[in-house]
């Protein structure tokens, strides 16, 4: 029977009164239960406390910035109200800053700007008009930064260029929205070229970028070790996508009939393999992104694939990837293991062979014109 809530004489048993302990055999402990240290609380009191608590919590709401009181509103105004806000251009600079906040945060802390260096080096051959080159350089920078925002979310990264990742500051949802917004801002910027081929290039390479990223994530999340050939295809889509985007846009705006895409494809592969190598060996890389971040991400990089496939019966490295460890000692052990399988030495040899191959392609494209200095400097930076 439920006590009358209006009665002031009905008391409830104190909540810390413990019943006799009964064993699994039904034996009841002979010791009397401890007396309550709390006095019985009348039901009207604890009901009143609950109401008070609800009232107090409702009056401590945090005020919203930019809010102000409005007078009574007539719902009939929606019969004639102009709801076409886009045509009235109500979008403000302040709202724009909200959207691009995560993008501008990362953009304000640039990396080594490898892509701008590449654009300028290839332009020695392609001789793109400066106005078009400015648009292309801006678009490539926007896409690169936006893609890094998404990468950091998908990889659960903590650091980017030695600073907290954008989604640790702005939140995951706002960061993803900002990156997606910038993808379309870049497309809008590209329309200034008034070149249909530029739009085709943009669409094709953005598709390739997401295809490569999708496979990279699939292997990580399903703990599936790809072959080297599958890895190279992924890199050609993911890393090579933005490289090709820049050069193919330049070719679309150039009057020089030269096809640089095969060379750019090789550069993209070298760049990614070299990045994988540095991730597991470079102290500078560790300071900017964390020690051996690929191991923490559970990523199947070039060295890790080689090491696992060198001895498939040993599951230690695969299990370390599965743990996505943040333990530095475990990561150092993994590096030692990969050294034992010859993966670092193998990667150095592959990079050396690919760099030599790229140099030969560069000299063939240059054909003695003396305009390949910038490309050779890029290749110098990719040697490990």
Swiss-Prot record:
Annotated site location: Important for determining product chain length: 183
Lineage: Eukaryota, Fungi, Dikarya, Ascomycota, Pezizomycotina
Similarity annotation: Belongs to the FPP/GGPP synthase family.
Pathway(s): Secondary metabolite biosynthesis
Entry EC no(s): 2.5.1.-, 2.5.1.1, 2.5.1.29, 2.5.1.10
Xref: PANTHER family: GERANYLGERANYL PYROPHOSPHATE SYNTHASE
One of the protein's GO biological processes: alcohol biosynthetic process
CDD domains noted in UniProt: Trans_IPPS_HT
UniProt keyword terms in alphabetical order: Magnesium, Metal-binding, Transferase
Gene Ontology MF: a single term: dimethylallyltranstransferase activity
Residue positions binding Mg(2+) 2: 151, 155
Name of the protein described by the UniProt record: Geranylgeranyl pyrophosphate synthase
Organism of this sequence: Hypoxylon pulicicidum
Residue ranges with Polar residues bias: 47-62
Gene name of the encoded protein: ggs1
């Amino acid at each position: 029977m439920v006590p009358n809530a209006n009665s002031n004489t009905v008391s409830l048993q104190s909540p810390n009164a413990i019943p006799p302990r009964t064993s699994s055999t039904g034996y009841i402990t002979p010791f009397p239960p401890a007396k309550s240290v709390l006095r019985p609380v009348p039901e009207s009191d604890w009901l009143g406390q609950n109401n008070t608590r609800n009232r107090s919590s409702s009056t401590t709401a945090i005020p919203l910035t930019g809010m102000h009181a409005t007078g009574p509103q007539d719902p009939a105004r929606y019969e004639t109200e102009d709801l076409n806000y886009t045509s009235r251009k109500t979008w403000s600079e302040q709202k724009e800053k909200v959207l691009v906040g995560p993008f501008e945060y990362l953009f304000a802390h640039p990396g080594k700007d490898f892509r701008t260096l590449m654009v300028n080096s290839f332009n020695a051959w392609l001789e793109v008009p400066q106005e078009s080159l400015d648009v292309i350089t801006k678009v490539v920078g926007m896409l690169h930064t936006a893609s890094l925002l998404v990468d950091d979310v998908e990889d659960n990264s903590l650091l980017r260029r030695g600073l907290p990742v954008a989604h640790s500051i702005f939140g995951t949802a706002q960061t993803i929205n900002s990156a997606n917004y910038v993808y379309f801002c870049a497309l809008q910027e590209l329309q200034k070229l008034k070149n249909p081929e530029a739009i085709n290039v943009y669409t094709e390479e953005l598709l390739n970028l997401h295809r490569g990223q999708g496979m990279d994530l699939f292997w990580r999340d399903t703990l599936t070790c790809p072959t080297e050939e599958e890895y190279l295809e992924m890199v050609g889509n993911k890393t090579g996508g933005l490289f090709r985007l820049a050069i193919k846009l330049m070719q679309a705006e150039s009057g020089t009939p030269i096809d640089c895409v095969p060379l750019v494809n090789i550069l993209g592969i070298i760049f990614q393999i070299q990045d994988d190598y540095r991730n597991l060996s470079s102290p500078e890389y560790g300071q900017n992104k964390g020690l051996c971040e690929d191991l923490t991400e559970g990523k199947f990089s070039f060295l890790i694939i080689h090491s696992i496939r060198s001895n498939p019966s040993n599951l230690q490295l695969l299990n370390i990837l599965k743990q996505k460890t943040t333990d530095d000692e475990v990561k150092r052990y993994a590096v030692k293991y990969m050294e034992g399988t010859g993966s670092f030495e193998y990667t150095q040899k592959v990079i050396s062979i690919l760099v030599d191959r790229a140099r030969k392609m560069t000299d063939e494209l240059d054909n003695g014109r003396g305009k390949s200095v910038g490309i050779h400097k890029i290749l110098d930076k990719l040697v490990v």
